[in-house]
C-alpha cells in the first residue's frame, strides 16, 4: 500500500438558520419504523470486522483520542447482519475518477458522459475517487474499505457539460441516467448561503429557478432558468427510487446552509428523500466523546441533516504506475456524505420494500442526538419524534440503530 500524506479540505456547503421550539411533521407512507430488520445478527462477525486493519485504516487523525469513523457509525454492526450493499447502486456526481484502483477494480461501475479523470496531482484532483472509496471501497483484505463494500457505482462528472450548452442540463441528464441507483451522492457545491440567495431572489423579484441559475452562471457553470428547472425536476424524479445526499460547505464560519445543499428550502418537492451532511470530529473514549463541528452547521436544513466524522481520513488516490496509492489526512463534508450514502445502500439491502422516503426517515429518526440540546423535533408518520438543532441536525449517523425498531428520542 503506497501512502501519501496530505491534509486537504474539500467541497461542501454551509448551515445555521434559527429554529424555534416547534415540531415539524414528515409523513411516512406507513408505520415502517415500528419494526427492524428480519436478518439475524452475528456479534462475532461484527467484532471480527471491526478489528481488521482494513476497517481501521479509514481513520487517520493526528488526535490520539480520535475514534474510527466507521466504528462511530456502527458500520461493523451492519456487517454483523451480513450487509454489504450487494445488489444496490450508489450514484456519485463528482470529478476525478479512476477505475484502476485496488479499492474499486472488482466493482461494477456505470459511467455517464465524459468523465474528469483522476490525475494524482493532489487529493482535490482525485476527489471522486476518494469519495467513491469512502462509500464503496472493497473489503478485499488490503488497504481500506468503504461503508458499503458490496455496492455498484454510477459515475458522472459535474464539471462537464457532455455536449450541452448548460451545466444543469448535464446534471439533470446524469441524474436521470442513474435510474437504478438507490442514492445519489453530491460531495460538491458552490459556497453561497441559502439565506443570502433568498435575499437576492426577493430583492430582484426573481423566481427561485432563475435565482439558482444566476448563481450557477456567475460561479462559472453556464446556466439559465430552463436548465435549472430541468435539474430540479430530475432531482425530484430521482426521489421516486433513491435518496439525494448533499454535502454541506466546509466553511465553518457560515451561519446557514449553502444553497445547493438547501435546495429543498427553495423547492419543497425535494424534501421527501433528501439528506445533508455535516462534518463532526469525534474524539475521546466511548461514552466520553467530544464533538467538534468542522464544517458549516446544518442551518436551514437541520430537519433533514445528519453528521459523521469526515476529519482526517484515508481515501484511494490515483497513480499511473500503481493501483494502491492512498491519500491520508483528507478532511471535509465531502467524506461525510459518502458515509451516509453507503448507509442508505446498506439499509436498502436490509429493507428491500422500503421506498426512499422511508429509508430517509429511518436514518434521521435513529441518529444519535444525545450530545446537544434540541431546537425542534420532526414527527414521523408513525408518531416517532426525533429532536434536531441548527448545528448538528439530527445528530450522528447510527446504522445499527437504523436497523432496529425506532422510538422517539
Task: List the predicted regions and their residue ranges.
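Classical Sec-dependent N-terminal signal peptides that target proteins to the secretory pathway
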Residues: 1-19
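Short, small-residue-rich loop/turn micro-motifs
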Residues: 108, 148-151, 188-190, 308-310, ...
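Extracytoplasmic/secreted envelope proteins and their assembly/folding machinery
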Residues: 75-76, 128, 132-135, 168-171, ...
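Substrate-binding/access-modulating region of protease and related hydrolase catalytic domains
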Residues: 17, 21, 28, 84, ...
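C-terminal subdomain of the subtilisin-like protease fold in secreted/lumenal serine endopeptidases
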Residues: 45, 67, 181-185, 276, ...
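Subtilisin-like serine protease catalytic core
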Residues: 26-57, 62-67, 76-112, 116-166, ...
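Residues immediately C-terminal
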Residues: 98, 253, 369
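Extracellular S/T/G-rich loop segment that most often corresponds to the catalytic His/Ser-adjacent loop
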Residues: 94, 263-345, 349, 353
Amino acid at each position: 500500500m503506497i501512502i501519501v500524506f496530505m491534509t486537504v479540505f474539500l467541497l461542501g456547503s454551509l448551515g445555521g438558520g434559527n429554529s424555534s421550539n416547534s415540531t415539524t411533521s414528515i409523513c411516512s407512507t406507513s408505520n415502517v419504523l415500528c419494526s427492524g430488520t428480519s436478518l439475524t445478527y452475528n456479534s462475532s462477525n461484527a467484532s471480527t470486522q471491526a478489528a481488521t486493519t482494513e476497517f481501521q485504516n479509514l481513520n487517520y487523525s493526528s488526535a490520539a483520542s480520535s475514534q474510527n469513523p466507521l466504528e462511530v457509525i456502527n458500520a461493523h454492526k451492519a456487517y454483523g447482519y451480513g450487509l454489504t450493499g450487494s445488489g444496490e447502486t450508489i450514484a456519485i456526481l463528482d470529478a476525478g475518477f479512476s477505475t484502476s484502483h485496488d479499492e474499486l477494480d472488482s466493482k461494477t461501475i456505470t459511467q455517464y458522459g465524459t468523465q474528469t479523470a483522476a490525475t494524482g496531482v493532489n487529493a482535490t484532483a482525485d476527489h471522486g475517487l476518494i469519495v467513491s472509496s469512502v462509500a464503496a471501497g472493497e473489503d478485499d483484505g488490503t488497504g481500506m474499505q468503504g461503508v458499503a463494500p458490496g455496492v455498484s457505482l454510477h459515475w458522472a462528472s459535474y464539471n462537464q457539460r457532455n455536449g450541452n450548452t448548460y451545466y444543469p442540463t448535464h446534471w439533470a441528464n446524469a441524474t436521470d441516467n442513474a435510474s437504478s441507483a438507490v442514492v445519489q451522492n453530491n460531495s460538491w457545491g458552490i459556497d453561497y448561503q441559502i439565506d443570502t440567495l433568498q435575499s437576492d431572489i426577493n430583492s430582484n423579484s426573481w423566481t427561485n429557478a432563475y435565482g439558482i441559475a444566476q448563481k450557477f452562471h456567475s460561479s462559472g457553470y453556464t446556466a439559465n432558468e430552463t436548465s435549472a428547472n430541468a435539474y430540479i425536476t430530475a432531482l425530484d424524479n430521482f426521489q421516486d427510487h433513491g435518496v439525494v445526499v448533499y454535502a454541506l460547505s466546509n466553511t465553518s464560519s457560515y451561519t446557514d446552509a449553502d444553497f445547493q445543499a438547501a435546495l429543498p428550502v427553495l423547492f419543497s418537492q425535494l424534501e421527501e428523500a433528501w439528506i445533508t451532511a455535516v462534518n463532526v470530529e469525534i474524539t475521546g473514549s466511548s461514552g466520553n466523546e467530544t464533538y467538534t463541528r468542522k464544517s458549516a452547521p446544518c442551518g436551514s436544513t437541520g430537519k433533514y441533516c445528519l453528521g459523521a466524522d469526515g476529519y482526517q481520513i484515508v481515501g484511494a488516490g490515483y497513480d499511473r504506475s500503481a493501483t494502491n496509492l492512498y491519500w491520508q489526512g483528507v478532511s471535509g463534508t465531502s467524506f461525510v456524505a459518502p458515509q451516509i450514502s453507503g448507509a442508505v445502500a446498506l439499509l436498502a439491502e436490509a429493507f428491500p420494500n422500503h421506498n426512499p422516503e422511508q429509508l430517509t426517515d429511518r436514518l434521521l429518526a435513529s441518529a444519535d442526538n444525545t450530545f446537544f440540546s434540541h431546537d425542534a423535533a420532526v414527527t414521523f408518520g408513525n408518531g416517532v419524534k426525533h429532536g434536531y438543532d441548527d448545528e448538528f441536525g439530527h445528530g450522528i449517523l447510527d446504522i445499527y440503530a437504523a436497523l432496529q425498531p425506532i422510538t422517539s428520542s
